[in-house]
Amino acid sequence: MQITLLFHTPLSVCSHATRTCWQSFEKGDCGGEKDKELIDRVGNKFKHASTLEHLNYTFYIQGISRACLQEVARHRHTSPSVKSTRYTLKELRNEAEFKIGDFENASRYLVLCGNEEVDNASIKALENLRTILQKSISLDIAKYCLPESYKTELTLTINARSLQNFISLRSSKSALWEIRNLANALFEALPQEHKFIFEHCLHKDIE
């Protein structure tokens, strides 16, 4: 899994939006400590979380499974652009046979869970897909036999309020292990000066 932060809204935009309510612009410091305190107090402590929606983040997320992607898609107020299997499954056509037990080779296309029986079943499904792609079957039809562990990538834009919800729910040990890793990786990818907005959302119970 690889996370790249492509864009983030400056804190000064959020503080300006917040100060609009009280017309207290003269008290701002262009995203400095005064503005950070205001954002934390109004958005987090006073729970006026709509002010946090002025902050947007765009991440490039690579190497998550389609199973994890389904979990991500359940979250509202996000804008995902996902790698299309319709146009990209042809990447498998020139591959050699994927053999049971060859986890290193299969991991180029699959997210492996560490359970040998499950991972070998995923490799078998990957090989079945590769075989089908050798035939004159359209990618639109062939993709129906994609294993859930097949790697994908997406560009995801999400506002701070929604990201708080995502991190709060998905960093919990009760979440799917892969999306738990994703939630923590998204937090780590944030600009250091933005992390104060999300620190209280992180679960500390990860083993």
UniProtKB/Swiss-Prot annotation:
Protein name: Flavin-dependent thymidylate synthase
Active site feature: R170 (involved in ionization of n3 of dump, leading to its activation)
Binding residues for dUMP: E71, V72, A73, R74, S84, T85, R86, K143, R170
Gene3D superfamilies: 3.30.1360.170
PANTHER family: FLAVIN-DEPENDENT THYMIDYLATE SYNTHASE
Residues given in the record as FAD binding sites: S50, R74, H75, R76, N159, A160, R161, N165
PROSITE patterns named in the record: THYX
Cofactor: binding details: Binds 4 FAD per tetramer. Each FAD binding site is formed by three monomers.
Protein family according to the UniProt entry: Belongs to the thymidylate synthase ThyX family.
Keyword terms, alphabetized: FAD, Flavoprotein, Methyltransferase, NADP, Nucleotide biosynthesis, Transferase
Pathway given in the UniProt record: Pyrimidine metabolism; dTTP biosynthesis
EC number assigned by the record: 2.1.1.148
Reaction catalysed by this enzyme: dUMP + (6R)-5,10-methylene-5,6,7,8-tetrahydrofolate + NADPH + H(+) = dTMP + (6S)-5,6,7,8-tetrahydrofolate + NADP(+)
Pfam family, one: Thy1
Top EC class, one word: transferase
Annotated organism of origin: Campylobacter jejuni subsp. jejuni serotype O:2 (strain ATCC 700819 / NCTC 11168)
